[in-house]
Swiss-Prot record:
It comes from Streptococcus pneumoniae (strain CGSP14). Keywords: Aminoacyl-tRNA synthetase, ATP-binding, Cytoplasm, Ligase, Metal-binding, Nucleotide-binding, Protein biosynthesis, Zinc. This is Methionine--tRNA ligase. Its EC number is 6.1.1.10. InterPro entries: aa-tRNA-synth_I_CS, Anticodon_Met, Met-tRNA_ligase_1, Met-tRNA_synth, Methionyl/Leucyl_tRNA_Synth, MetRS_core, MetRS_Zn, Rossmann-like_a/b/a_fold. It holds the Pfam family tRNA-synt_1g. A motif ('KMSKS' region) lies at residues 329-333.
């Protein structure tokens, strides 16, 4: 089976924060899991380097768009690598290949009569002498009344036309823009209404999408799909490849989602592979993103793929709700955020991955608090998992000269461990990463109870053979837990591999024992509880500057 996984493309206009990681981490868990199962996996993403957000940042910093995009693309790649993300290709939308393929796709849709031109009213800033891209316009959302950008409301997730905003202002100069006429290409979304309704019903019946994706997509389809502009008068982006329109750019929402396909082509060309191995009706596809990206993955991208007759359509939609910070909405403009390139310097990547998974905003908003993060690390990763491994292996190292006993106990504890592979695997495949990790740590608690109940320290005096069997059983548990946790917290898994000089890279139950331990080391260090107040204070101070 081939597995395609697409992670949402962050805008290269500012650093990544913990909210980005919470939404994107399920993609890496899926990729690692399926690779361990032996499936063919293609996991792609990239930096969104076109469109308005980068232009706004460039204007503010008096830099070129390329300088801004280059800086953040490099930072993104390094940050994802430090967090253990295993993209097969992390690309960017300003690459020549992306531009070339998007223009080809645009022409294919034009030739198929899915694109047509239309004269429209668009906002123009007389002070800055330019048509305003949607994100250059701010005002009140006409649906819910909250402050919004011109392209989409963060509060109600509505896709907007900036002309409909109330109290419109140019985000560059804060002046009120005027309405002028311009001509653009439109995509015939209305022709795909019935197809998308069938597509949605199938996803709902088979429970392949999260509820927020089902409900939001239902709302859009119930309201009826309007045709939408696919070109804009933008300062940067991909030029429209048709005479008379070459000064216009292909709208970012169209070309950014096409990045999943262009990155796949790029990967295939680099490795001399066949793109159709992953773009066919037998491939299982996952799209991993935040709640605000739902319509782009459940309506826009499926409609474009259908027009191009490219398969598969997005099958699994792993759409996270929002992550708050200390019970307040993350705000990059107010610096109320924990930046990934900062937290990764101070804390173990596995600690970050663990907390953002066990506390994931899968079905409802979740909160990141420094207290919970540090207590979670100390009590679960260190206190439960790390302690079980350390006390078992230190016992073997001290009393058996690191020689691992050869005979283990068959019983309920190992039967449950074998069954756990199926339980966790099914949960991961259906996108329930939080519950999968909870199941593993529930088992870890039972493993600690097994150790305490069997009392190997007492058996060493009264029944040395039984003591060896208990320790060997615990080693089997450690090996399988290390392997099963690899998709979630891979860096600790590597430490376990090093201690046993073995590989933990399949999704099959391990029953063979290694002969000898290498140097035993702690998987995790305790975090001083004083860090809680220090981190909260730093957050408050930086956000008030």
């Amino acid at each position: 089976m081939s597995i395609f996984i697409g992670g949402a493309w962050p805008y290269a206009n500012g650093s990544l924060h913990i909210g980005h990681a919470a939404a994107l981490l399920p993609g890496d868990i899926l990729a690692r899991y399926y690779r361990q199962k032996g499936e063919e996996v293609l996991y792609v993403s990239g930096s969104d380097c076109n469109g308005t957000p980068i232009s706004i940042r460039a204007k503010k910093e008096n830099k070129s768009v390329k300088e801004i995009a280059d800086f953040y693309h490099k930072e993104f790649k390094e940050t994802f690598e430090k967090l253990g993300f295993t993209y097969d290709l992390y690309s960017r939308t300003d690459s020549p290949l992306h531009h070339e393929i998007v223009q080809e796709l645009f022409l294919q849709l034009y030739e198929k009569k899915f694109l047509y031109t239309k004269k429209i009213k668009q906002l123009y800033c007389t002070f800055d002498n330019q048509f305003l891209p949607d994100r250059f316009v701010e005002g009140k959302c006409p649906n819910c009344g909250t402050h919004s950008r011109g392209d989409q409301c963060d509060n109600c997730s509505a896709i907007l036309d900036p002309i409909d905003l109330v109290d419109k202002r140019c985000s560059i100069c804060s002046n009120e823009p005027e309405v002028r006429e311009t001509e653009h290409f439109y995509y015939v979304f209305s022709e795909f209404q019935n197809l998308l309704e069938t597509y949605l019903n199938d996803a709902e019946e088979t429970v392949r999408w999260r509820k927020n994706a089902i409900n939001l997509t239902k709302r859009y389809l119930r309201e009826g799909l309007p045709d939408r502009a696919v070109t804009r008068d933008l300062p940067n982006g991909i030029p429209v490849p048709i005479d008379g329109f070459r000064d216009k750019k292909i709208y970012v929402w169209f070309e950014a989602v096409a990045g999943y396909y262009t990155a796949s082509v790029d990967w295939a060309q680099k490795l001399q592979n066949n793109i159709t191995d992953f773009w066919n009706n037998r491939t299982k596809s996952y799209y991993v993103h935040g709640k605000d990206n739902i319509p782009f993955h459940t309506i826009i991208w499926p409609a474009i793929l259908s027009g191009l007759e490219i398969e598969p359509l997005p099958e699994y939609i792993i759409s996270s709700e929002y992550l708050t910070l200390e019970n307040k909405k993350i705000s990059t403009s107010n610096n109320w955020a924990i930046w990934l390139n900062d937290i990764i310097k101070k804390y173990d990547a596995d600690s970050i991955r663990y907390f953002l998974t066990i506390n994931a905003p899968e079905m409802k908003d979740a909160n990141f608090s420094w207290r919970e993060f540090i207590y979670s690390h100390n009590s679960e990763l260190l206190g439960s998992y790390g302690n079980f491994i350390n006390r078992t292996l230190k016992f073997i190292e001290k009393y058996f000269e690191s020689e691992i006993p050869t005979k283990y106990l068959e019983g309920e504890i190992l039967y449950n461990l074998k069954e756990l592979y199926t339980t966790v695997g099914n949960l991961v495949e259906s996108g329930h990463m939080k519950q999968a990790l909870e199941e593993i740590f529930e088992y870890i608690r039972s493993a600690n109870k097994f150790y305490d109940d069997m009392k190997p320290w007492a058996l060493r005096e009264s029944d040395i053979e039984k003591c060896k069997e208990v320790l060997a059983t615990c080693v089997i548990i450690i090996l399988n837990l290390g392997q099963m946790l690899n998709p979630f917290i891979p860096f600790s898994g590597k430490k376990i591999e090093d201690m046993f000089k073995t590989k933990l890279n399949t999704w099959n139950y391990i029953s063979n024992l290694p002969n000898k331990l290498s140097d035993v080391s702690m998987l995790f260090d305790r975090i001083d509880l004083k860090k809680i107040d220090e981190e909260v204070l730093e957050l408050q101070q930086t956000s008030s500057r």
